[in-house]
Curated annotation (Swiss-Prot):
InterPro entries reported for this sequence: TMEM127 (IPR033331), TMEM127_TM (IPR046795)
Encoding gene (name): TMEM127
Principal location listed in the UniProt entry: membrane
GO biological process terms on file: endosome organization; negative regulation of cell population proliferation; negative regulation of TOR signaling; regulation of TOR signaling
Residues found modified as N-acetylmethionine: 1
Phenotype when changing residue 140 to Y: In PCC; localized diffusely within the cytoplasm
Free-text function comment from the UniProt entry: Controls cell proliferation acting as a negative regulator of TOR signaling pathway mediated by mTORC1. May act as a tumor suppressor.
Tissues and organs where the protein is expressed, per its UniProt entry: Widely expressed.
Full protein name: Transmembrane protein 127
Note: Consistent with the observation that mTORC1 signaling regulates cell growth and size in many species, TMEM127 knockdown cells are larger and proliferate at higher rates compared to control cell lines. In contrast, cell proliferation is reduced in cells overexpressing TMEM127.
Similarity-based family: Belongs to the TMEM127 family.
Taxonomic source organism: Homo sapiens (Human)
Spans traversing the lipid bilayer: 96-116, 130-150, 169-189
Length: 238
């Protein structure tokens, strides 16, 4: 007997979704959080390379700007001799540099998770709840706190060693400080983009995976069913 096309297709083919389109899948990749993450990485790297972290005026220090690049590795003796900084300030600036490096690593890992969207459960939870972005925000806040502490120590040292008796001494933040603040703000935006995004439940994900496997097992293209409906029935045989 003749079986109508689509009801008993060879190989037990399963139907596609209406219109023959592929089943919708929930992508784990997120451009909305990857873009602020990239800005955060760029800002932190620039802050480390930029020599202008603190601006000094009115003291005996011959330098007008100080940064963490002055204390990475070799510290020039003139910085200590001219009372630009003391050993405690050097240590604080090195701690600031260490937290900047940690912030770059966390922000880079968050960026890679947002771009590639791995399906591993642990990595998926880490990305969805923006743990790496949150760590970047905390590290940027720590850098800002240590920068304020370092500025107070340098200000006190410059007030003790004024260039002239009536010199007005002040220490202000330079471009690198604001770059770190901007990196923290970008990480906050990336965190919000991940946390406010709607994700399917575990049951919905399992259903989507099952339907996707059924779709991949189809031995015939979607057009086969339409063509088969217009084929004439076979000749009658007694």
């Amino acid at each position: 007997m003749y079986a109508p096309g689509g009801a008993g297709l060879p190989g037990g083919r399963r139907r596609r979704s209406p219109g023959g389109s592929a089943l919708p899948k929930q992508p784990e990749r997120s451009l909305a959080s990857a873009l602020p993450g990239a800005l955060s990485i760029t800002a932190l790297c620039t802050a480390l390379a930029e020599p202008a972290w603190l601006h000094i005026h009115g003291g005996t220090c011959s330098r007008q700007e100080l940064g963490v690049s002055d204390v990475l590795g070799y510290v020039h003796p003139d910085l200590l001799k001219d009372f630009c900084m003391n050993p405690q300030t050097v240590l604080l600036l090195r701690v600031i540099a260490a937290f900047c490096f940690l912030g770059i690593l966390c922000s880079l890992s968050a960026f890679l998770l947002d771009v590639f969207g791995p399906k591993h459960p642990a990595l998926k939870i880490t990305r969805r709840y923006a743990f790496a972005h949150i760590l970047t925000v905390l590290q940027c806040a720590t850098v800002i706190g240590f920068s304020y502490w370092a500025s107070e120590l340098i200000l006190a040292q410059q007030q003790q060693h004024k260039k002239y008796h009536g010199s007005q001494v002040y220490v202000t933040f330079a471009v690198s400080f604001y770059l770190v603040a901007g990196a923290g703000g970008a990480s906050i935006l990336a965190t919000a983009a991940n946390l406010l995004r709607h994700y399917p439940t575990e049951e919905e994900e399992q259903a989507l995976e099952l339907l996707s496997e059924m779709e991949e097992n189809e031995p015939y293209p979607a057009e086969y069913e339409v063509i088969n409906q217009f084929q004439p029935p076979p000749a009658y045989t007694p």
